[in-house]
Structures are given as C-alpha cells and as structure tokens.
Amino acid sequence: MSPALAAGLQIAFVLAVLAIAYVPVGDYMARVYSSTRDLRVESVIYRVGRIDSRAEQTWYGYAASVLGFSLASALFLYFLQRIQGVLPLSDGLSGVSPAVAFNTAISFVANTNWQSYTPETTMSNFVQPVGLAVQNFVSAAVGMAVAIALVRGFIRVARGGEIGNFWVDLTRGSLRILLPFSFVIALILLSQGVIQSFHSGFASTGLDGNAVTNALAPVASQEAIKELGTNGGGILAANSAHPFENPTPLSNIVEILAILLIPVCLTRTFGTLVGDRRQGLTLLAVMGILWSGLLAVTLAAESGARGVAATAAGSMMEGKEVRFGIPGSALFAVATTGTSTGAVNSAHDSMSPLGGGAVLLNMLLGEIAPGGVGTGLYGILVLALIAVFVGGLLVGRTPEYLGKKLGRREITLAALSILVMPALVLIGTAITVILGSTTGYQGNGGDPGTPGSIHGFSEVLYAFASASNNNGSAFGGLTVTSDWFQSSLGICMLLGRFLPIIFVLALAGALASQKKVAPTAGTLPTSGPMFTGLLTGTVVLVAALTFFPALALGPLAEALQ
C-alpha cells in the first residue's frame, strides 16, 4: 500500500467516525448540561459537599470556585508527590523533589501534563492513578464547565450575570461524560494489548544481551482519559510511542479519535444549546479548514526526503515508529497539537523544519483546531467575537453575536483573553534566549545563524508555546530540568490556563446580564460561508501578526537553510 493511500484511508476513517458520533455525542452533552435532574450518586456528592445544586453563581462566584478547586487540587497533588515514599506501591521510589513536584502539580491541574521527569523512575503506581489520573478527569471537566458557562452567557437574558453552578457542571462532566466514555475507550485499548497492571515491572534481556527492567503500570485506564480529556501526560516516558501505551495501528486510530471526539462534538453541543445548529457547524467548518491545512503541510513535509538518512529511507522516518509510519505519526501530531493534548507517538524534535513548524503553528493559533476539551470551544468563540467586531467596524454598526451586543467591556475581555498566550510565549522565549546560562540546556546550539542555533531557538519557542497553551508536548532536545525552566514554564502553565478562564467567565457574566436584541437587515450573519471565511481569516491574521517574526527566526529560517 502506498503511503498516500494509507494516509487517505486513515484520515477518511477518522473523519467518518467523527461524523457518525457528531450528532449523538453533541446532543448528549447538551442534555447533560441542561438537565434539571441529578443522578443519585451526584445527589450524594452534593450532600457530602454541602452543595445546593439548584443555586446559581455569578461569574465571579463561578471563577472563585474554579480557582479554589484548582488550588486545592494542586496542593493535594504536590503533597502526594512529596510523601510518595511512605505511600503504598512506592516500589522504593522516594518523594519527588520540590521543583519537580511544583511543576507537575501545576501541569496536571492546568490540563497541560508537561513532564520534566521520567515517569517510570519518578512516579509510583499509587501516585499515578490517585494523583495524576484524577486530575486528568477533573481538569478536563473544568475546561468543559467554563465553555458551557460561556454558552449560557449567550442564551440567558437579563439574569443578573448568573451563568450556572460550577460544582454541578464539574460533577456532571466528570461522571456523565468523561468517566463512561473513558471506560469504553480503555476496554478497546485493552483489547489491542495496552497493559493494565500494578506490578512494579519485570526483567528481560535486550537485543544487545544486557538485562533490561520493563516498567509496568495501570496504563489502559489512564491512557483513555489521557487522550479523551486532552491531557497528554504519558504513564511511560515514551508516551504513545511506547508499545505498552499504543501497540497497534488500530490503537493509534482509537487514541486519535479519543483526542478529537469531545472538542469536535462540543460545537454541536453549542449549536443545540443556543437553538441554532448552523452556528456550531460554522465553528466546526473553521476548525476543519485549519486542521486540514496544517495536516496537509505536515504530511507533505514528512513524506519528503531531506538529508542523507531521510533520502535513504525515502521519507523523514527518524523519530517515528515503523508500525505507524508517516501517516499515523503526522495525523497524531496534528491532532495532539491542534488540541491541548500534547501526547506524542513520534519525536516532534526530529520532524522536518516545515513539519515541526506546522505543529508549532497549530499551538500558536490558540489550539482551536479543534482545541482542547472545553478550551477549544471557548477559545474559538472569543475569536468569533473579535471577527464580529471587525465586521461591525467595516459596516459601521454595533457588533452583535447571537442577539447580544458587543460593547467596550465585552471586546476588552475578549482581547485580554487572546493576548495572554502570545505575551507568555514571546516574553518567556525572549528572556530565555537572553539568559546565557540557559544555552547549555539546548540540545542544539552554535554561532548565530547556523542550523544548530536556529533549531535551538525553535526548541525554546516550542517549549513556551506548549506550556502557555497547556499542551505539554516538547521538542525533546531541550533539557528542562533546571530551576529556570521548572519555574518559568510552571508560571506560563498557570497563567496560560487561569487568566483566560477568568476573562472568559467575566465575558460570560457580561453577556448573561444583557437583553437580546432582534436581528435586523444590517446584522452580520454569523453562520454560513461568509462568516466562516471571516473567522478563518481573523484567526490566521492574529497569529501571523503576532508570531511571524518568531517563526521566521526558527522553523522558517531552518527550512530555508
């Protein structure tokens, strides 16, 4: 089978399954968040937590709940890592160092799963499921809750800014969506050979004749939510390139589908909740255009042959698993960087300059193609407001979106939400490059303008883009175990996650306080091909104006060498 045919069949299968799941999954999630009934287990949780499930919260009450819950989660995870040595199933592992524990706690609570440690030799089989896997569920549920709160801002009329109840949204997202879906995915992965074990490991003899210790862990259960919740942190160091996590081409497709399922179907949920499904289809079309374009660039770049090794192999196979090949690796890479997942089944640092630049650009677009669980929906909705504002300026009318006027307050909050990520990426990269002491941690270096120094810059840019977008993938040539990277990337993960959430919730409250205005002949249509083009152009223009100089110094310069 030719590589082109293999790529086409895999892409067609993924798109076909997503198309089949789009309506039922999207409508199911809409029913979950709009239901007035609580499950029995939910009622028990509310009673134990003294939560009034019928009480509504204003945006600042909702935001305070998000921040309070996330802070408590981070503290719990931090101290769990620090006392790991006295916990069950520690297998001789001591407590995690303060810097790594801090970075990891922020990383998993922020849905980033950036890993500056080797999982097999750092985290025990107790901390993995009790600490990290739990955060994989609840951090994803937090993102979904914030997205639904913003949607309520559009559909509620003069409600005093009430946008729902965070604790109810968190509980329903975890128990009704993430848990059952993860269970099904875990069973499928188990059938493909993904392991599920609490044994410490086993010894074997390698091909070179030396003894090898193979780590075992409860992988299947965590692998499912790792992908479904767009978390991405591997329970094994090689992540989804490891045969214990992703053993077959079919398991690879299942993991790609798990990554894309909820972000794609949330556009249907949005359309259903606002009462106009064309709105959701328009957002989905924009996501699809961006995702398809970057996938085409990545496939073309990786299928070419550049350099002696690539020419001999016929394609850029360095850093890729033979069982997946170019199509499975490129499809996974674009899926994982277009969402906030960050899981990898190949070495992104070994990709061609244009291929690596494409997955980097996928993050720099704001991870909206299709975006993370919840974060993708509220990210593209904020950009839709900017597009409507630009359209309103062109025709000289007050911009409106779904019957809500976009005044100074709304546009200011939308702009602030968009500006957080670029500021963190560019400032963090600039400071790191200026600091001469950090150059020793780059796997590539040299005099300015040489290929090594250019790729070294790309590694730093990728790291801060990944942390600030809560992605978690990396160009592995950069060593990030120093105190500078542990602290700076931790701050980027923290601010990149929670500052946009605060601005989005404030925006939801402002919208929910308004009355709806009836559309007129001069109202800009926000569904259909015209708005699809306007929104796509806005996304590309914002990213191009912001990041083109940095990309020109990194991937583009390397591609032109």
From Swiss-Prot:
Superkingdom, taxonomy of origin = Bacteria
Residue ranges crossing the lipid bilayer per the database entry: 5-25, 60-80, 86-106, 130-150, 177-197, 247-267, 281-301, 324-344, 376-396, 415-435, 491-511, 533-553
Q: Which UniProt keywords apply?
A: Cell membrane, Ion transport, Membrane, Potassium, Potassium transport, Transmembrane, Transmembrane helix, Transport
UniProt keyword Disulfide bond present? no
Molecular function as annotated in GO: P-type potassium transmembrane transporter activity; potassium ion binding
Q: Report one GO cellular component.
A: plasma membrane
What is the membrane topology here? Answer: Multi-pass membrane protein
Query: What is the name of this protein?
Result: Potassium-transporting ATPase potassium-binding subunit
Originating species: Rhodococcus erythropolis (strain PR4 / NBRC 100887)
Which gene is the coding source of this polypeptide chain? Answer: kdpA
